Regions:
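Conserved beta-loop-alpha segment that forms the PLP phosphate-binding cup at the N-terminus of a helix
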Residues: 1-28
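Internal helical hairpin/lid segments
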Residues: 12-16, 193-263
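Active-site-proximal loop->helix
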Residues: 25-37
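Active-site phosphate-binding strand-loop segment of PLP-dependent enzymes
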Residues: 51-119, 132
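Conserved active-site segment immediately N-terminal to the catalytic lysine
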Residues: 126-138, 148
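Active-site C-terminal subdomain of aminotransferase-like
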Residues: 138-229, 297
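Conserved C-terminal alpha-helix-loop-beta "cap" of PLP-dependent enzymes
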Residues: 232-304
Length: 318
């Protein structure tokens, strides 16, 4: 994320779609690195269709019409948006992303999508107008965290080649040169790479391809729907509003600290992720826990995954 920001956003007008704490990270990177101060942030909000549930209101992204209008007004060089926001379980639909792309391209800018938490919900960069897609070996790919993955179309590559990064180690243009050398059968050096981790990642990609990428995508949605159904049966409310619920990261409300911190689940032998703030103006009482449904092991054993979770949840709630 920082490599992309330092290469493409330095002293530029930027617009950020912030749906939670991990898209707040764009703001942290821009401020800490003094990359640009010309930034517009559009935050998630309580959905119009959210019924009266006290403090447990469901969130949705800024309306796409508002985002498009802001892009047309501010004319950003870069729009940063999260496909899936890990803190909220919010996922941007394909059509939402396409409209972002169309809008930013109409003013000469680039669309950068953070797909680190997408799981196996693959995005078609060309069809959706994504210029830069960021991912990582962990989570959906089920591999060892060791590097950042930056995929770029021709427009993004052209912009990288005509800009200068403000970092040595995270110089995206330099790493693009390194990658090209390897693609052409050569070798180049900029910094020592995590070779073992990268080879493990290569093997995991091959494993996923052998299973079938479309099959994994379908499995991701099926698993997410079944886990959400279990939660709904226990009257546990999703933070993400209907239509924006990610199948790979499910975030739900709780009033119990031991569930919020994950300790209640750990006592039943189940590891989950503790809740984190959204940084979108949510109330101080905001308290959640998060379920990461990543991993080839889960996607190839959906019924077993759902059964183990349901059994643990019932013991936690007993």
């Amino acid at each position: 994320m920082e490599a992309v920001a330092r290469q493409l956003a330095t002293d530029q007008t930027v617009l950020i779609i912030r749906n939670g704490f991990f898209s707040f990270r764009w703001t942290q990177i821009l401020e800490k690195g003094r990359i640009t101060d010309d930034v517009t942030v559009l935050t998630a909000h309580i959905g119009d269709n959210s019924d009266s549930m006290g403090q447990q209101q469901q969130f949705e992204p800024v309306a796409i019409e508002t985002a498009v209008a802001e892009i047309q007004s501010k004319k950003p060089a870069v729009v940063f948006a999260p496909h899936v926001e890990t803190a909220a379980g919010l996922m941007l639909p394909d059509d939402y992303i396409k409209q972002l792309g169309d809008a930013v391209h109409s003013v000469g800018g680039l669309l950068v999508i953070d797909c680190i938490a997408s799981g196996c919900v693959w995005l078609d960069m060309k069809a959706l107008g994504i210029d830069v897609l960021i991912s990582a070996p962990q989570k959906g790919w089920s591999s060892t965290p060791c590097a950042g993955l930056v995929m770029m179309n021709e427009q993004a590559v052209a912009k990288v080649e005509t800009t200068e990064s403000t970092s040595f180690g995270l110089d995206l243009k330099q790493w693009l040169t390194i990658m090209r050398a390897y693609e052409n059968g050569g070798h180049a050096y900029h910094a020592t790479m995590p070779t073992d981790g990268l080879t493990k990642f290569r093997d995991t990609v091959k494993e996923a391809e052998a299973i079938g990428l479309d099959k994994l995508k379908s499995a991701q949605f099926e698993l997410g729907e079944k886990i959400l159904s279990v939660l709904n049966q226990h009257d546990i409310i999703s933070v993400a509003a209907e239509g924006y619920q990610a199948p790979g990261v499910i975030v739900v409300y709780t009033e119990r600290d031991d569930m919020h911190k994950g300790a209640a689940f750990a006592a039943q032998g189940l590891q989950i992720a503790g809740g984190v703030p959204l940084k979108v103006g949510e109330p101080d009482s905001f308290k959640t826990f998060r379920l990461g449904l990543f991993g080839l092991d889960k996607l190839t054993d959906i019924d077993g995954t759902v059964s183990r979770f349901e059994q643990a949840l019932e013991k936690v709630l007993a």
